[in-house]
Amino acid sequence: MYYWTDLHLEHDDKDDRIVEAVAAAFEIATESVTVGRIDDAVQDAWNAPGLQVLVQRDDPVPGRLEFPVTLMVTLRHGTGVGDPVSKVRAIARNLGIGLITDVETQGDTWRLVMPDGKDKLVQLDPSSDQGTLLLTRQDRQELDRHRVAVA
């Protein structure tokens, strides 16, 4: 099941775990989501200009309560910056990632080197002003721990 939204996620009570997982993912990705009601945290994150979210809910895991969730965050920005490194930095700034010590190229994927060691990966589309923030393995582990905690 897919959810696509600009500002909010349409959900009912049985999808609360998805909302919690998305909020946790945003907290991991942006490091700027304040603790509060889950819906408020998600709404705050989605109110960022140009932020769009695709959430895929996979089939339930046999014997477990939670759903595996795949999250893709895509940000469109209108900076008009042509330099790829500047473009990645602009995407990162718009995502609330302010402290970047370096940008490393890995093909179409750019690693944003963070001073705290929690590097971020951005998938860059060189033909447009678009970038996708990818969850790293560490991000996914933190998200998994959160999902187990709320289950």
Question: Could you tell me what each predicted segment is?
Answer:
Residues 89, 97-151:
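Acidic, proline/glycine-rich low-complexity IDRs
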Residues 1-30:
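Short, extreme N-terminal segment that most often corresponds to the first beta-strand
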Residues 31-81:
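Short, intrinsically disordered low-complexity segments
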Residues 4-10, 52-54, 68-72, 98-100, ...:
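Ordered hydrophobic segments in well-structured contexts
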Residues 26-32, 92-101:
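Structural alpha-beta junctions
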Residues 78-99:
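Short, hydrophobic/π-rich interface segment
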Residues 2-4, 64-68, 92:
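A general secondary-structure signal for short beta-strands and their flanking turns/coil
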Residues 12, 74-76, 104-106:
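Short, flexible beta-strand-to-coil junctions
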